[in-house]
């Protein structure tokens, strides 16, 4: 089947770039070789050999012009070469299937930021992305609601498809292996260890967590993986950037999501699939799909709520009943890559029929 994917890059990074790589892997498993149009590629990835790569160079352009220029070039290439159906992970008016993994108005509101001129441009491009596409794929109900509220997208046009996770990579390990992982990371056994995976600390709520861990008397430790932190505190440790984040999920006792804006939060699902429950802010997109002992929910605007959630987590840890024995039962959807990719293929087939 002829398919095209667009994104800012095809490389091992967070968020939407990791999602694009996952789509390529899923399509490869179905013997589909897509055309991928991006600003940059990591040619050392095995996935690079599974695609027809088309690079749109934006080197030398001011940063604020790069996305509009990429959109303009992408539209011209698609029209000239009859590429498609186009699954657009980046914001572009060329999309046939527009992936909605976040909205810029939603981000600005959550972060209490006043829109600047560059934000107005981003919102305008996002509006084109969502309104011109034949279908919008929302990665959470929160994103579906924001697409309706901020961009006037009709509910009938939106398809809710929670993002996929590589179930082979993110899976539990036995107790002995987990103990070795904890030892390798030098995690204490006399404290409940909470993980924050973050490359944007303000949005991810590090300040909130730092205040909590500074004042708590519970036997706890917060470890941070991702961007370096500038906090020195006895209960907080930095683990660095991790290419083996699945082993960190397995080793810790809980993952914590305290984001001011979290359209989905794939780390929540990845953590659960590794057998590790999540302490999660109630507004996070992944809170929609975490079930039972897979989650402990708290309210971002209520410090007492976070205190209660952490106390519940520590109590379960002390009782030795915090691990998730059956991860699939702690999720409200099937996160397999195959299911997600086949859903996108179904939409692409409908695009062709129109």
Predicted regions and their residues:
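A short helix/loop element that forms part of the nucleotide-sugar donor recognition site in Leloir-type
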Residues: 171-187, 321
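Conserved acidic donor-binding segment of nucleotide-sugar-dependent glycosyltransferases
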Residues: 292-304, 311-318
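A charged, aromatic-enriched C-terminal amphipathic alpha-helix characteristic of glycosyltransferases
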Residues: 318-352
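Short alpha-helical donor nucleotide-sugar binding micro-motif in glycosyltransferases
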Residues: 241-242, 248-252
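Carbohydrate-associated surface elements
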Residues: 142, 164
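Conserved donor-binding/catalytic core segment of Leloir-type glycosyltransferases
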Residues: 137, 188-204, 210-213
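Short hydrophobic beta-strand element within catalytic cores of glycosyltransferases
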Residues: 277-281
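Aromatic "clamp/platform" in nucleotide-sugar-dependent glycosyltransferases that forms part
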Residues: 260
